[in-house]
Amino acid sequence: MPDTVDNEDMFDLDRQPVNFKDVLIEMKDVSELMVDLAYSAILFESKEIAREVVNLEESMNRLLYQARITSILGARRLEEAESMSGLLQIAEGAERISNAASDIANVILKDIQIPIRMRRALPEAEEVTVRIEISESSELVNALLGEVRLQSTTGMRIIAIRRGRFWIYDPDKDTRLEKGDVLIAKGPEDGIDPLWRLAGRALPQIDPGIGQPVDNLDRAVLLIVEMKNVSELAVGLAYTALLFDSKDIAEEVFWLNERMDSMRLSLELWVLEEAKKIEPIESLRGLLHMAAFADAICSAASSIVDVIRRDIEIPPIFKKIIRESDEIISRIDVQAGSFLDGKTLKEASLGAVTGMIVLAIKRGEQWIYRPKKNARLYEGDTIIAKGRRDGECRLFSLSKAEQ
């Protein structure tokens, strides 16, 4: 992505966030939205969504410029310059994530084929994206998003709304829903059913494909889905490592990046071996772009936590950035006798009940990253989760000892 944008926009600083904290909050939020929209553009073959991703890239250009200017103006001593360099590295990591999202959006705009099996497999990821139309009888009609609290009641977050020919991206709590609105939502799989019910729709039956042979293309597609899961985990853990100044979590991010490199090499080798056997061969280009997308996100996450490996002090303002962004990181201890004590993640249905995604569990000195649904919670466990603030409140109440 070019680092230059229109000079008139660049120097009209009155339209820019006024301090480094505001800039970084917006960069974090915009980069995460771009990734969500990029995957949505692939899943639904939507050039409209892809164009919005490209438009958001221009916003990231301006924000990065503002971050650089603010860091230069804000550092008066060597110690301040070192802290600013760490924050600037985080900002550039967010911009790298947005670059990757823009690249994959351009794949859609250039009509580069994505295998249909790839689109069918994306709903099998750990965080799924769905599209649903609000029926006339739905209780969501005429409701404000802030009133219905979809993420904390279903686990699904609305990232876009199509209303007729128009799109509303990253809707806020004051967005009013209307009959016929098409919602693009992202969240855990167990949040799909309650969202469909709220929208007044019957959950469609999906052919599971039982008995169908799994060929090499299926395996390649599943590998890319795993790469998507790993890249999203890496970003969440990167911000967690910075928030809690954890070298253990930072090292996990570096390890995930190494694993991502291995997975991408495996996919590239598979493409070279299968190129003569698969028709149309153009569809393999789409797989390579998808793999590069996930790899770039994971690499950006690794660059974000590099400040911990190099012992660069992260100023306290960073905690405010994480706490004031759209998606926050939470650390919550499980108390004895609480609702969560002794339950598996599946039994607790944390995704649907709170809208929070569990990134890791700390038990004593051991970390369990990306815990499975059968992972059981016990007294003294520390949960690291990401989600919205109201979901954090619900998770906290579930972790407290019952009176």
Question: Can you name each region flagged by the protein language model?
Answer:
Residues 1-403:
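Cytosolic, long alpha-helical scaffolding segments
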